[in-house]
C-alpha cells in the first residue's frame, strides 16, 4: 500500500551503492542458522538456485527500470544482472495507469519445467494494482515470456493485488497468495497449465484492529501443517521502520491459520518470529525458500538504514519456525 510510496522516496539516495556486491559468510551452511547479510540494496527479496548459481530478485530501485536481479556462483560474490522488464509492458497501463517505472515484490519458483515469475505493478497509496506473470525455461538465458495479467484490484475491491507468492499444497497443486493492507491476505488456487486463478478467493489473514498493517505472505508445508508468514506494521522508513515477521499454522492451506496462542490470523493473530535488533531494523518482505531457508530484508542501522538481504536457515523441530 503506502509502503511503496515511502520506499520510492527512500531509494533516491541509493544510486551510489549499486556497484557494491553482496557478501555472505557461507554459500550453503549445513547447520549454521545465519548465512549472513548483504552489502547491497535489496528489498522484498525472493531467491532461487539454478544449477550452481543463486539468483536473488527484488523490488526495482527508483534509479532502475524493472525488477532487480543479482547472481552468485558461491553466495559470497554477487553481481548485478540486467533487470527484468527494462521496457514496460503495454498492458500494465490498462490496469494501473499511474504505475512507476519499477515493479514490486517478485516471487520466483520452478514448476513443470519452467521458472514462473510473479510480480506487482501498482499506483502509490491506492489498491489500483495488478499482479503479472512471466515464464522462462532458464534464468541464465533470460528470454522471459509475458504471460499477462494474473489478478487485479481497483478501488471497488476490498483487497490489494500486490506481494504475490506462488506456493504448493501437499499434493503439489499450485496456489497464489497475495495482499497488502485493506482486508488482508488472500489465497486462490491456480490452473496447472496457465498458472492463473481457477477457483475461489479465500481470506487467510487480516489485522482489523491495526490499520490493516500486514502484507508479504509466504507459505510452506511442513510436518502436516501449512505455515503462513506475513509482515506486520510499517516498512520502508529506514531505521524508523517497524516491520516484523509473524506466523501461524493450519492443517488446511485455506485456513484457519492460528498463532502459538491459538488466535486466528484473520483476527490479527500472529506469533512474532523476528522484530529486529539494534543493528537490523524492520525485518520483513520475507520469502521461504525450499521450505528451510528464510530470506528477508532489514534496514542496517550501521549503514544509514539501507535495506539489505538477510538469510537464515529455518528450524522446524519444535513444530514452529525458529532460527
Swiss-Prot record:
Disruption phenotype: Cells lacking this gene retains about 40% of the capacity to hydrolyze linear arabinan compared to the wild-type.
GO cellular component: extracellular region
Protein's GO biological process: arabinan catabolic process
Positions that bind substrate: 44, 125, 160-163, 180-182
UniProt site positions, description: Important for catalytic activity, responsible for pKa modulation of the active site Glu and correct orientation of both the proton donor and substrate: 163
Temperature dependence: Optimum temperature is 60 degrees Celsius. At 80 degrees Celsius retains about 2% of activity.
Keyword Transferase among UniProt keywords: no
Reactions performed catalytically: Endohydrolysis of (1->5)-alpha-arabinofuranosidic linkages in (1->5)-arabinans
Cofactor(s), names only, from the UniProt record: Ca(2+)
Positions of the catalytic residues: 44, 215
Activity profile over pH: Optimum pH is 6.0. At pH 4.0 the arabinosidase retains about 8% of activity.
Effect the entry attributes to changing residue 182 to A: Same binding affinity as wild-type
EC number: 3.2.1.99
Induction: Induced by arabinose and arabina,n and repressed by glucose.
Cofactor binding, note field: Binds 1 Ca(2+) ion per subunit.
Keyword entries, A-Z: Calcium, Carbohydrate metabolism, Glycosidase, Hydrolase, Metal-binding, Secreted, Signal
Superkingdom: Bacteria
Pathway entry: Glycan metabolism; L-arabinan degradation
Leader peptide range in chain numbering: 1-32
Subcellular location: Secreted
PANTHER family: ARABINAN ENDO-1,5-ALPHA-L-ARABINOSIDASE, ARABINAN ENDO-1,5-ALPHA-L-ARABINOSIDASE A-RELATED
Job of this protein: Involved in the degradation of arabinan and is a key enzyme in the complete degradation of the plant cell wall. Catalyzes the internal cleavage of alpha-(1->5)-L-arabinofuranosyl residues of linear 1,5-alpha-L-arabinan and of branched sugar beet arabinan. It displays no activity against heavily substituted arabinans or a range of other polysaccharides (larch wood arabinogalactan, wheat arabinoxylan and p-nitrophenyl-alpha-L-arabinofuranoside). The enzyme activity is progressively reduced as alpha-(1->5)-chains become shorter or more highly substituted.
Record protein name field: Extracellular endo-alpha-(1->5)-L-arabinanase 1
